[in-house]
Amino acid sequence: LRVVAGDAMRRESLGPAVGGHDAVLCILGAKPEGADARRGQPGVPICSAGTKHLIAAMTAAGVRRLVVVSSASVGESRGTGRFPAPWVLRTLLREVMDDKEIQEAAVRGSGLDWTIVRPVKMTNGPRTGRVQVGPALRWGLGSRVSRADAAAVMLGTLSDANSIGAALTVTGA
């Protein structure tokens, strides 16, 4: 594993970052506030725009394997959430969820060997190894998973050919 810096909003910075690698893990995310200082560009759909830039850079560099973090309540996982979880997320985080939908569509249409990982609410807790992973897991407002466990799932998909072309919800066990 080698961590390489790049700016997802500057397409030209991504070529050198992805070239020569076997796979790319995309963990873009944004807070829903319009003035998110870390994002630096209020209103910019960083997940979808950044992922499209990343896909273009990967295609140009010949890198085939992509693992992307999305979110529970995106795509078909919206239908596996226990009420009122999907409704709450889609209402309170509409801009973020819409951006994630566009991001996932770009990944699915990329022609790359992709996996989408959809964690529930992430915490800063330690890695426990106690997770559930699957395309149709039930989840709710109380569902949690640590960032460390979600990262371990992402890394695990790299050696799992069955995860290619799959969108997987991740929850703590």
Predicted feature residues:
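SDR active-site strand-loop-helix element
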Residues: L25-L28, L66-A72, V117-P119
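Conserved beta-loop-beta element that borders a ligand/cofactor-binding pocket
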Residues: E104-P126
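Conserved catalytic-site region of short-chain dehydrogenase/reductase
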Residues: E33, A72-R78, M122-G125
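Mid/C-terminal beta-alpha module of Rossmann-like enzyme folds, strongest
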Residues: R64, A136-A173
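Conserved Rossmann-fold NAD(P)-dependent oxidoreductase catalytic core, especially the SDR/UDP-sugar
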Residues: R38, P42-E95, Q103, G109
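NAD(P)H-binding glycine-rich loop region in Rossmannoid oxidoreductase-like domains
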Residues: L1-H53, A57-A60, L158
